């Protein structure tokens, strides 16, 4: 495949995704709604993530003049397109022009890329910055350059401001530097890159120190390091899920590259790509085995990993490269259709395939309507999913929205920054999916119901009119 053909495939899939977003019929997922809310309250850090995604969303909403779902999710395909173009140049510089087109076409059709081109996440931005850092790093292995060292440091620093998962690449990269002479760069360039990365990351590190290491503690919490125990099934499930994240043939090729390295059949460049990718998969598989890990936690492996797989397939199994592009390409074309027909695509148990992306805004609108009827403009909830959507869906209304104040440490950004103030008195509307009683009064039940589809299907939701003091921790 020529570079021109690869470029056309990248542009073609991007255009398809941009057009299909116009017909998206799903709600924001809780994380997307939260990222949007962060963008309305700019800071140097947040409860669960560094600040980059909020800054990027704010830039888009300012440029577009809209807070609509379309414009925010549009960032996904556009940034992935940019990452694909950077990877093409990286592959050309590190391997040669023969895989430049294949690298771009393969990356843009990865299942994980297809998914995050529809539902926006931090992974999208993270992959872009890692691609930039990798391009500069490979350049530095060939020549000394202050400019490339600055770019590498900037890429790593901005990746850190996006998601701390960039650090998963460090152990493998360090091993490559120790074992492979061709992987080493000039000491001066290392110092420059590290210094720039540190300066870029410093504002978020300072923010964490000022907020009791909130983001760091949250990262530890979701990793479940306090509940360590060997569970081989979890590890195997995570490992198997990687065949779905990048496609079966691409992940197989990455494993094949490891086998080749162990058998002494790979050259230094192939070894470098292995060390910059597969240790990430190994680390997160270990994390899944002893605690917990989500399928996308190893995503940082698939920047270098894509180049590695494409190169090996190009040399040893060209038919596999074409087959992979066909399989992943078809899946990538079909996936946006699931967001256009979310109510029609059902699983065998009757649930919508897009269940967790449906029914959220409807609950928020119901709460708003009942608040108006009840004569209050204050809506409180103890559910993170609900408060996230309340802020987004009711963004143009005048309701005052709060999370119920926690009894201990906050467990979300909303409890941390937007908990119900103690000085609020009088009646408020309380939305919950759990049982609720008050010691000092009998709450007035405005509505109890069970949604028939979407994220809250099968759950009993309740809306009460109650004194604010009843919601005190």
Curated annotation (Swiss-Prot):
| A GO CC term assigned to this protein in UniProt | plasma membrane
GO BP field: lipid A biosynthetic process; lipopolysaccharide biosynthetic process
* Keywords associated with the record: Cell membrane, Glycosyltransferase, Lipid A biosynthesis, Lipid biosynthesis, Lipid metabolism, Lipopolysaccharide biosynthesis, Membrane, Transferase, Transmembrane, Transmembrane helix
Q: Its topology with respect to the membrane?
A: Multi-pass membrane protein
Q: Where are the transmembrane segments?
A: 6-26, 68-88, 94-114, 118-138, 160-180, 190-210, 238-258, 271-291, 295-315, 327-347
Q: What is its EC number?
A: 2.4.1.-
Q: What class of enzyme is it?
A: transferase
Question: Where is the protein found, in the record's own terms?
Answer: Cell membrane
Major subcellular site? membrane
Reported phenotype of the disruption mutant: Cells lacking this gene produce lipid A that lacks any detectable GalA. Inactivation of this gene also results in a product that is affected in the addition of GalA to all positions in the LPS core oligosaccharide, possibly by acting as a less than an optimal substrate for RgtA, RgtB and RgtC. The mutant strains are more susceptible to deoxycholic acid and to the polycationic antimicrobial peptide PmxB when compared with the parent strain.
Function, as annotated, reads: Involved in the modification of the lipopolysaccharide (LPS) lipid A moiety. Catalyzes the transfer of a galacturonic acid (GalA) residue to the 4'-position of 4'-dephosphorylated lipid A, using dodecaprenyl phosphate-GalA as the donor substrate. Acts before the other GalA transferases RgtA, RgtB and RgtC.
Q: What is this protein called?
A: Lipid A galacturonosyltransferase RgtD
Provide the species name: Rhizobium johnstonii (strain DSM 114642 / LMG 32736 / 3841) (Rhizobium leguminosarum bv. viciae)
């Amino acid at each position: 495949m020529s570079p021109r053909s690869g470029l056309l495939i990248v542009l073609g899939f991007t255009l398809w995704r941009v057009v299909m977003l116009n017909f998206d019929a799903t709600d924001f997922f809780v994380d997307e709604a939260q990222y949007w809310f962060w963008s309305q309250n700019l800071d140097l850090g947040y409860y669960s993530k560094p600040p980059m995604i909020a800054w990027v969303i704010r830039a888009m909403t300012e440029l577009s003049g809209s807070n609509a779902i379309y414009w925010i999710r549009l960032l996904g395909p556009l940034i992935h397109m940019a990452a694909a173009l950077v990877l093409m140049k990286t592959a050309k510089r590190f391997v040669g022009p023969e895989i430049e087109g294949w690298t771009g076409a393969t990356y843009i059709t990865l299942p994980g890329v297809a998914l995050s081109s529809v539902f926006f996440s931090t992974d999208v931005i993270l992959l872009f910055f890692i691609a930039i850092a990798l391009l500069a790093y490979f350049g530095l292995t060939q020549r000394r350059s202050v400019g490339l060292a600055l770019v590498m440091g900037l890429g790593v620093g901005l990746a850190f401001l996006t998601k701390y998962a960039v650090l998963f690449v460090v152990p493998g990269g360090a091993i490559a530097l120790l074992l492979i002479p061709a992987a080493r760069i000039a000491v001066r360039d290392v110092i420059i890159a590290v210094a720039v990365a540190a300066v870029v990351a410093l504002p978020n590190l300072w923010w964490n120190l000022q907020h009791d290491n909130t983001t760091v503690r949250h990262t530890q919490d979701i990793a479940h390091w306090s509940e360590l125990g060997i569970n081989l099934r979890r590890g195997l499930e995570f490992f198997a899920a990687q065949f779905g994240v990048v496609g079966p043939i691409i992940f197989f090729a990455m494993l094949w590259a490891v086998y080749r390295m162990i058998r002494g059949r790979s050259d230094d460049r192939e070894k470098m790509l292995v060390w910059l990718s597969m240790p990430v998969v190994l680390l997160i598989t270990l994390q899944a085995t002893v605690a917990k890990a989500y399928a996308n936690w190893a995503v940082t492996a698939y920047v270098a990993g894509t180049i590695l797989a494409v190169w090996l397939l190009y040399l040893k199994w060209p038919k596999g490269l074409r087959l992979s592009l066909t399989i992943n390409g078809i899946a990538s074309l079909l996936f946006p259709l699931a967001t256009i027909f979310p109510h029609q695509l059902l699983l065998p148990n009757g649930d919508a395939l897009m269940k967790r992306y449906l029914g959220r805004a409807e609950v928020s609108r119901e709460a708003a309507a009942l608040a108006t009827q009840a004569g209050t403009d204050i809506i409180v909830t103890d559910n993170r999913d609900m408060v996230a959507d309340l802020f987004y869906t009711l963004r143009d209304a005048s309701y005052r929205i709060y999370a119920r104040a926690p009894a201990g440490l906050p467990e979300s950004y909303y409890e941390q920054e937007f908990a119900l103030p103690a000085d609020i008195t009088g009646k408020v509307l309380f939305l919950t999916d759990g049982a609720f009683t008050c010691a000092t009064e009998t709450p007035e039940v405005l509505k109890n119901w069970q949604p028939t589809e979407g994220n809250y299907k099968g759950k009993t939701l309740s809306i009460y009119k109650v004194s604010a003091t009843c919601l005190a921790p």
